Amino acid sequence: MRKLAIASIRVYQYAISPMMASHCRFYPSCSCYALEAIETHGLLRGGWLSLRRLGRCHPWNPGGYDPVPTHNTSNSSPMAE
């Protein structure tokens, strides 16, 4: 299942994304973030992190540098802030 998710993202990156204007608000791009998140954290947690990232990608968010969290950090932990 993990390989299928990664393959789907790669197809998007190489076949669909080049036809669209590059306008991702974040670095790395959302598709690169999703790949790294799934490769680092697995399909379940990586997929959740990717969905949260896509939810933040809208015109009212300034964007910027947003790396995939490491294994020993959590976005929901008050200590990580």
UniProtKB/Swiss-Prot annotation:
Which keywords annotate this record? Cell inner membrane, Cell membrane, Membrane
Q: Which HAMAP family match?
A: UPF0161_YidD
Instruction: Give the membrane topology, semicolon-separated if more than one.
Output: Peripheral membrane protein
Q: From which source organism is this entry? A: Stutzerimonas stutzeri (strain A1501) (Pseudomonas stutzeri)
Q: Which NCBIfam families match?
A: membrane protein insertion efficiency factor YidD
Record keyword Cell membrane present: yes
Protein's UniProt name: Putative membrane protein insertion efficiency factor
The UniProt annotation puts the region (Disordered) at 60-81
Give a short account of what the protein does.
Could be involved in insertion of integral membrane proteins into the membrane.
Whether Cell membrane counts among this entry's keywords is: yes
Biased region (Polar residues) positions are 70-81
Q: Localized where?
A: Cell inner membrane
Q: Which family is this sequence assigned to? A: Belongs to the UPF0161 family.
The cross-references to InterPro entries, in alphabetical order and at most eight, read: Membr_insert_effic_factor_YidD
An annotated GO cellular component of this protein is: plasma membrane
